[in-house]
């Protein structure tokens, strides 16, 4: 081997090596002529396997599901017709704080200034529109125009994804993947974490501890950014140090153990997990947030918006305390050091324990009675153990899922900031690819499923035993509760038959119908025996059968949506 050969590799191989080095074993793809050469380099790189997807939206959602389990993911699509579709799912990854590396092929560099019109474009000579969009939806976007620039640009994008917990975009022209570039340096330069500024960390924890010492009823609140910050264990340490009541936001379910002695429920305003949870939270004199995020959904149409004068919050890289903001203070380090500086503040935990809500176990329905939502959830609850990951689709599945009891080790996945119906099925596929040893269960409605259900095809292809409970109530239930109209009624499908229709000649998917509790029990037994592919159980329930929480929440959100314009807006 010559000296030059030892110091160079191709751009495609460079990207493949970096993906493997950061822990990616599978990349999700939809092929197109602008990315085919790149896909060859990725496919044949040791330790990296391709997962084909049915379309680019599903590809992006599958990658974000993989990132939920693996910590980071990669999706590869073609230019314009592929990437513009994928951007929807990448927007979700941005909103949900998930590092997904979106790689798009692009036209041959010789055509960019040639005056040629190219396919898969707008039919103009503007080839920058995709990059302009990508910059709005990612924390870093790079286009490799020269092979010698590839290492720095690829490393920069990957590092930003890791540091900012957001998606990034890498554009590689079709004639660039096979071009030589320098070999990579140590991966530590890309993945090494940043640490807090020591002086800022000390000052922030001192002021926070002093503020807490002056309060009688502080509480802790875990938010949706807690997991991405890697601060779950630090949150537990602070809960134990303060010995106060510790709550979670709905999008943080599963990030803090429901079996922990300080756990006090899901706070969600008037649709909180219990009246006791709501009362204790709202009587507190200081909310200590860890990665909290307040929007119109999480505040029930702004009715549960926090009082900023009593909110202390730690974000990824900053801490805000009434009257102060500290930059370069990382969440996990802040919570851990703060735990060493505070004393016990048990008033809120004592108040919660005095009126602790009793666990109500629903009675089994009559075996031959018409199936209803409560019976479906009762039987799903019986499947949830420490090895379960439960997906709750946007809609009433949110509220059904939040009522589930999670034992230690169980995980829960929602998409509450982006709120894209249809997200759960492709995301669960990606999750199951990353964590095949776990039991992945999906709760999804009929309307949501119709957007992305064909991704069951990849569950069949890769023999992923995902268990899908499809609640068929013949419409967009969440939209009905927010604002009803004929547009919320959909064409009914035979969803169980649809699932099996994707088997082809060799697939092992099972599609089953359940119209009674007895039939659901039998269907679950069949599902648990099917280890070679997914099982979809179509649960027929009444159109109006939904949680009261969805009804109440829907009215509040509808009211917020209907506010008339004001003079200042």
Swiss-Prot record:
Region Thiamine pyrophosphate binding, residue ranges: 396-478
InterPro entries named among the record's database cross-references: DHS-like_NAD/FAD-binding_dom, PDC/IPDC-like, THDP-binding, Thiamin_PyroP_enz_cen_dom, Thiamin_PyroP_enz_TPP-bd_dom, TPP-bd_CS, TPP_enzyme_TPP-bd, TPP_PDC_IPDC
Catalytic activity: a 2-oxocarboxylate + H(+) = an aldehyde + CO2
One Gene Ontology CC term in the entry: cytosol
UniProt keyword annotations, A-Z: Decarboxylase, Lyase, Magnesium, Metal-binding, Phosphoprotein, Thiamine pyrophosphate
Positions bound to substrate: 33, 120, 479
Assembly description: Homotetramer.
Protein's recorded name: Probable pyruvate decarboxylase Pdc101
């Amino acid at each position: 081997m010559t000296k030059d050969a030892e110091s160079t590799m191709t751009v495609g191989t460079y990207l493949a090596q970096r993906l493997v080095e950061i822990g990616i074993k599978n990349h999700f793809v939809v092929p197109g002529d602008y990315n085919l050469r790149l896909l060859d380099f990725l496919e044949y790189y040791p330790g990296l396997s391709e997962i084909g997807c049915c379309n680019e939206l599903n590809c992006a959602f599958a990658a974000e599901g993989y990132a939920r389990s693996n910590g980071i993911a990669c999706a590869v699509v073609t230019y314009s017709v592929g990437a513009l579709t994928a951007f929807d799912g990448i927007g979700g990854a941005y909103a949900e704080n998930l590092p997904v590396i979106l790689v798009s092929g692009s036209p041959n560099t010789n055509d960019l200034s040639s005056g040629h019109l190219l396919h898969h474009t707008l039919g103009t000579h503007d080839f920058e529109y995709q990059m302009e969009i990508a910059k709005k939806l990612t924390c870093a976007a790079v286009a490799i125009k020269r092979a010698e620039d590839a290492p720095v640009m690829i490393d920069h994008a990957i590092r930003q994804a890791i540091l900012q917990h957001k998606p990034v975009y890498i554009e590689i022209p079709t004639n660039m993947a096979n071009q030589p570039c320098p070999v990579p340096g140590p991966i530590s330069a890309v993945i090494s974490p940043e640490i807090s500024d020591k002086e800022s960390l000390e000052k922030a924890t001192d002021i926070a501890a002093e503020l807490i010492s002056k309060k009688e009823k502080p509480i802790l609140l875990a938010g949706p950014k807690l997991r991405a910050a890697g601060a779950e264990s630090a949150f537990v340490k602070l809960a134990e140090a303060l010995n106060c009541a510790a709550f979670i936001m709905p999008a943080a379910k599963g990030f803090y153990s429901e079996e922990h002695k300080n756990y006090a429920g899901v706070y969600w305003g008037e649709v909180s997990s219990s009246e006791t949870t709501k009362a204790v939270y709202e009587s507190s004199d200081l909310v200590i947030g860890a990665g909290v995020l307040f929007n119109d959904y999480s505040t029930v149409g702004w009715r549960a918006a926090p009082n900023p004068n009593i909110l202390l919050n730690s974000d990824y890289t900053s801490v805000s305390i009434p009257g102060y903001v500290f930059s370069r203070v990382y969440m996990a380090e802040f919570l851990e050091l703060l735990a060493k500086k505070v004393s016990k503040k048990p008033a809120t935990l004592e108040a919660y324990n005095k009126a602790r809500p009793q666990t109500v176990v629903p009675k089994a329905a009559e075996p031959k009675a018409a199936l209803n939502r409560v019976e479906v959830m009762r039987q799903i609850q019986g499947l949830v153990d420490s090895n379960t990951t439960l997906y709750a689709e946007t809609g009433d599945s949110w509220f059904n899922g939040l009522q589930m009891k999670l034992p230690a080790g169980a995980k829960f996945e929602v998409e509450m900031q982006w709120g894209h119906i249809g997200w759960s099925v492709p995301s669960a596929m990606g999750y199951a690819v990353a964590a095949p040893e776990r039991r992945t269960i999906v709760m999804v409605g009929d309307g949501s499923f119709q957007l992305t259900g064909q991704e069951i095809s990849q569950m069949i292809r890769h023999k992923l035993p995902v268990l899908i409970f499809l609640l068929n109530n013949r419409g967009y239930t969440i939209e009905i509760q927010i604002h009803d109209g004929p547009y919320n009624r959909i064409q009914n499908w035979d969803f169980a038959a649809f699932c099996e229709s994707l088997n082809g000649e060799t697939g092992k998917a099972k599609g089953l119908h359940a119209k009674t509790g007895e039939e659901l029990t039998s269907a679950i037994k069949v599902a648990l025996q099917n280890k070679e592919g997914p099982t979809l159980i179509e649960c027929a329930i009444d159109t109006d059968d939904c949680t009261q929480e969805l009804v109440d929440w829907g009215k509040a959100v509808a009211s917020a949506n209907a506010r008339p314009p004001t003079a200042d807006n």
